Every structure is written in structure tokens, then in C-alpha cells.
């Protein structure tokens, strides 16, 4: 087992990475201080893993309840969140009750938000079961739900007590879900570590096949980068915003198509291709770097051509973004591979990238 620590002073917490973690009661024990835990999971994950976690918690002498929610991004909303609150109140959960998020990013985000809100804050543990949630969304304390007008617009920062990333759970992922998680792995290399990006390029075939050793290293490499960023900028006032590389375009794709039509990682993958094109168009990266990002995204079985939402609709959707200020859209771009920054961009260049992303094969030279 590998452990990466998120250094937030008295709110620091461990990220444990390895195989067979769901059954290890000793990993849960330090973080469940009350008499009860409530597992929040979904209809897909519950039959696979809920019993293992329940058994581990009961072996500690704790009561455990399990809330099973519908599966999918389209359920990341108020109605579903209220089902968690209903279950907590019905079970008599108190301020020492620990919530356990057992599932992917949707479950993690909603469980964390419920933990932030219930009785003004209760502890929770992240047990991510998808690649995307293991390498990204389970780390850093961002929680929330979607609104019809924008993704993740309602939420809170609420750090977990611990993250248990069991690599074994990735073996049951559909290929499409595994690919979606690779988008965030690629993102971390692109924004923070060119050597890590090159390692992903060299090992993409084995990663696509979910090789255990390679996947363990990918999760470790990504959470190492994210943990370092979160430790420096927990509330996303500066550096942490660079973790949104590809997300401004990606969130617009998700909202424009309807949540759930594309997986989040698929939209981020395409968004990274678009952000790389915009970075090149503005003179920050060369054509080879842009094409490396596009080629690796494609090799990870992610979409590289954007849906035809229309340029004006894309721009309208991107204005509803947490990074936007006074209606001005901000983008995470690359100065070079491994170095990202946040900026505004000229409207003409943005429109050119949007047209290019839909109409041109992504490896062609940009349209002037």
C-alpha cells in the first residue's frame, strides 16, 4: 500500500492506494469516532462492494446504514441530495456520524456536500471506485451538485478524513468509464509534470488494459500532484484553478448536451484538446505539444472532436463558470507542457478554436 498525505495542518489526511483496501477495517478505524457510519453508494456499486465495507465497519463495533442512490450524472441534483438527508435523519445520525462515499465522482461530490451541510458539518471518508474519482475528485474537498444552468455551481469545500483508493475496484469499470478517468490522469501531466506526461504516453496501452502496477503508479502520480496543489491553495484562489485545464470547455459540453450524455472525463478530454489548440493559437505552445496532447487523448479512447453546439451557445455556456468574473470567461492554458496558467483570451481566437474543434480533424494545423 502507498500513502500520500494532503498537508492541511490540523485537517491533513491520508490517501491510501493499493489492493484489497475495502476490507481493511484498520484503515477506517481512526476516522470513525462516533457509534455509527452511513455508507452512500449507488445502484451499480452497491452489489459489488457495499457488503465488504459494511463488514469492515461492523467489525469495529459500529452501527452502519447504507443509502443506495440512482447512478449517473443526471442525478447529481437537489432531489437526490435530499434522499441522503432523509436517510440520515431517519437513522438518527448525529454530529459524530461518519459518512462514507462509496462510488465515483457523483457519489463523492454529493456525499461530501451532504456531510458539509448536515448538522452544519459531519466527517466523511472518500472510498472512490472509479479512476476519475481516485485520481481527482476524491482529493481536495470540493463537493457539490449541478444546477440546470451550470455544473457544480452549488457546493462547499469540505475535506474528507481519509481517501481509500482500492485499485481492485477499477477492474469492474466499463472501458468507457476507465477512459474517462484517464482524462484526469493526462490533465495532471499536462499542467504540472512533463515527465509524468511522457510516462503516460509510454504506458498508455497498459493503462488502457488496467494493468494493476501501472494503474497504481498512475493513481499515485496524479494524487501526488493534486495533493501538492491543494496544500498550497485549498480554496482555489490561484494555483488550484489550474486543475481545471480542459474543464471550461468540458463543462460547456456537458451542460450543452445534457448531463450524462457525455461522461465528465470525456468532456474534459475533448476540452483539453480545445484548450491546447487555444494555447497554440495564442503562441504559448508549439504545434508538436498541441498534437501530443491530442494524440494522447485519442490514444486513451477519448473524444477529440467537439459536439456542434454552435459557437455562440458554447460561449454562453462558458460564461456560467466558477472562474468567470463579471461575465468574463477565464481559461486554463499551457505556457509549456507541465506549466499551466489562468487567463482571459481574445474573442476572435476563442471563436476560431471553437470552429476548429468541431469542423477540423484535431491534428491539422490551426485555421488562421
Curated annotation (Swiss-Prot):
NAD(+) binds at residues 71-76, 105-109, 129-130, 142, 151, 169-172. It comes from the Bacteria. Signal peptide: none annotated. Zn(2+) binds at residues 184, 247, 264. Its EC number is 4.2.3.4. GO terms for biological process: amino acid biosynthetic process; aromatic amino acid family biosynthetic process; chorismate biosynthetic process. Disulfide bonds: none annotated. CDD domains: DHQS. Its cofactor is Co(2+); Zn(2+); NAD(+). It catalyses: 7-phospho-2-dehydro-3-deoxy-D-arabino-heptonate = 3-dehydroquinate + phosphate. One of its GO terms (cellular component) is cytoplasm. NCBIfam families: aroB. Catalyzes the conversion of 3-deoxy-D-arabino-heptulosonate 7-phosphate (DAHP) to dehydroquinate (DHQ). Belongs to the sugar phosphate cyclases superfamily. Dehydroquinate synthase family. This is 3-dehydroquinate synthase. It comes from Ralstonia pickettii (strain 12J).
